[in-house]
């Protein structure tokens, strides 16, 4: 069953516009850069994202949102625990983030 992986960022106030642009570009590059160890092909089914534009005032300071889709929990687990491209990105971006939130779910499972 497909797994959605939602990632929310709040960049630090002193993060430059260039850093934010690089961070969001690198986040989106995960779709092609994360390679499955068995198939040797990209395994993130979908990845979209953008800057928060909500008018509801309930963003808690979150500035950017991304939604990924994986084919299975196993693929999501590999991404989180073992993917070297993802690990390198996490190491780089963490110093520019004030806050991040990650939520995963299987569609229709409540």
Name what the model sees in each region.
Residues 28-35, 86-89, 97:
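A common structural junction motif
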């Amino acid at each position: 069953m497909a797994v959605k992986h939602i990632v929310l960022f709040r960049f630090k106030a002193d993060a430059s516009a260039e850093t934010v642009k690089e961070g969001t570009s690198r986040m989106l590059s995960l779709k092609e850069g994360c390679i499955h160890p068995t198939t040797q092909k990209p395994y993130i089914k979908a990845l979209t994202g953008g800057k928060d534009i909500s008018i509801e005032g309930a963003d808690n300071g979150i500035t950017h949102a991304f939604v990924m889709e994986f084919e299975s929990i196993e693929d999501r687990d590999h991404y989180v625990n073992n993917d070297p491209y993802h690990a390198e990105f996490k190491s780089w971006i963490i110093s520019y983030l004030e806050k991040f939130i990650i939520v995963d779910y299987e569609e229709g499972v409540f």
